[in-house]
Swiss-Prot record:
Keyword presence, Repeat: no
Protein name: Apolipoprotein C-I, acidic form
Further comment found in the protein's record: Apolipoprotein C-I is present in acidic (APOC1A) and basic (APOC1B) forms in P.paniscus, P.abelii and P.troglodytes and perhaps also in baboons and macaques. The two genes for ApoC-I arose through a duplication process that occurred after the divergence of New World monkeys from the human lineage. In human, the acidic form has become a pseudogene sometime between the divergence of bonobos and chimpanzees from the human lineage and the appearance of the Denisovans. Pseudogenization resulted when the codon for the penultimate amino acid in the signal sequence was changed to a stop codon.
Source domain of life: Eukaryota
Assigned protein family: Belongs to the apolipoprotein C1 family.
Single GO cellular component term: high-density lipoprotein particle
Any one biological process term the GO annotation gives: negative regulation of cholesterol transport
Length: 83
């Protein structure tokens, strides 16, 4: 009885082994696994440079600096008067 059950199992296992790997399990890609990471780094670098250039060329930093300076000056004057 054992031999009768083990023969079909053996045939199925042999057919699976001889069939070969599935297409998704084919030979692994031999390219550098860090290519995707390198591309991500370059994209991030380019976007960061563009963002910094856009900020430095805009008027926003100057306006913010003027606003902070003016607010600080007012607070300083108010503290001098109260003292």
């Amino acid at each position: 009885m054992r031999l009768f059950l083990s023969l079909p199992v053996l045939v199925v296992v042999l057919s699976m082994v001889l069939e070969g790997p599935a297409p998704a399990q084919g030979a692994p890609d031999v390219s550098n696994p860090f290519d995707g990471l390198e591309e991500l780094g370059k994209t991030l670098e380019d976007n960061t440079r563009e963002f910094i250039n856009r900020i430095t060329q805009s008027e926003l930093p100057a306006k913010m600096w003027d606003w902070f300076s003016e607010t600080f000056r007012r607070v300083k004057e108010k503290l001098k008067i109260d003292s």
